[in-house]
Amino acid sequence: MDFNKENINMVDAKKAKKTVVATGIGNAMEWFDFGVYAYTTAYIGANFFSPVENADIRQMLTFAALAIAFLLRPIGGVVFGIIGDKYGRKVVLTSTIILMAFSTLTIGLLPSYDQIGLWAPILLLLARVLQGFSTGGEYAGAMTYVAESSPDKRRNSLGSGLEIGTLSGYIAASIMIAVLTFFLTDEQMASFGWRIPFLLGLFLGLFGLYLRRKLEESPVFENDVATQPERDNINFLQIIRFYYKDIFVCFVAVVFFNVTNYMVTAYLPTYLEQVIKLDATTTSVLITCVMAIMIPLALMFGKLADKIGEKKVFLIGTGGLTLFSIIAFMLLHSQSFVVIVIGIFILGFFLSTYEATMPGSLPTMFYSHIRYRTLSVTFNISVSIFGGTTPLVATWLVTKTGDPLAPAYYLTAISVIGFLVITFLHLSTAGKSLKGSYPNVDNEQDRAYYAEHPKEALWWVKERKN
């Protein structure tokens, strides 16, 4: 491949920060919806699965509706990934946030089982399916867009900003549920209170749409289209054949990230209420505080990843959860409130290492012309099988074994696998150009350096297979 120094991408760091805000709103929307659903599962179950008398089974059905929707995420990933690689990242990101806002609003408007019978859970499932389909193109698109718009040397620190949206969305959901449960009686929450957050989610979606319409296309995508007008026509089977190792590493990384993520954000509130017997308000406050602490932690680990490499930060997370998952869950059973808080914080601390590094690292595993679709499909298949099913699996493990520490064993096993895969198969890409692209720089000094060192600028050429 002939090197042309004029193709080195000069990006504006300030504009990159605005990009993080606009894309982070979509993450906030996704996790606001998910957080509200997780916190209101008891009310949703009572409204849509009221004929089921057993509370545990009703809870599992409510989580199952969530898990089934995750099966649509890979389909959304395929559709939006192909569109994103062909027509650009921006068009997908503006579409997905509209669909997410609509599905969230729909859940808040649905009649209950007592009003329309079996149609109630069917419509609930369809709303979750639409949510799953749209989010199939959302997060991978946001990661890709931010990675392609950021200076290479700051990719992880800026990427970690995406998770501010994720955590903020969940915090907003937690605060809203805490406020509602404080001012409304349980009967009022079951009747109409649980619907309020879903209805308000519409405004968050509209705000995100407003910001995203102002985005420009990512400089990497524009540069690649300009320099490679006849982009490689490669199908998914060829992608798997050429890049199976990268796909496998990405798949495993998404597994240990999302099992931990959904364990803490989706399952832990239910665990604290049903197993530990904390009240809903206390649970909401605890989770909210831990999420708030995770925001500066994620930003800190993002900066650290740019300095020492994301691989080492990955290993801090997987190694830490291998050693401390069981201990953290044991602390949750303490009679001391402070000790319970420490147990939750341990889980949140190590989760923040993933929140910091995944957005800036996963897009680097794939070449530009296949990045969106490959990341989107790999990410969503992994999330569908392991992430979205985590609350259901954890609930089933506790019910089946009678051991309240069963979720910790599951988390430990996943962390061990992640630690081994990252140790032996992952190549750190912090500070390097994205595969298939020229470097992204934000100053003339870096631009001049890469102009004089083309092999470092295009380090990926020697391993490209198509």
UniProtKB/Swiss-Prot annotation:
GO molecular function: symporter activity
Superkingdom of this protein's organism: Bacteria
Transmembrane domains' residue ranges: 20-42, 63-83, 91-111, 116-136, 164-184, 191-211, 247-267, 285-305, 313-332, 337-354, 377-397, 405-425
UniProt keyword annotation of Transmembrane present: yes
Any one annotated GO CC term: plasma membrane
InterPro entries the record matches: H+-coupled_symporters, MFS, MFS_dom, MFS_trans_sf, Sugar_transporter_CS
Protein localization: Cell membrane
Pfam families registered for this protein in UniProt: MFS_1 (PF07690)
Family: Belongs to the major facilitator superfamily. Metabolite:H+ Symporter (MHS) family (TC 2.A.1.6) family.
Descriptive protein name: Putative proline/betaine transporter
Gene that produces this protein: proP
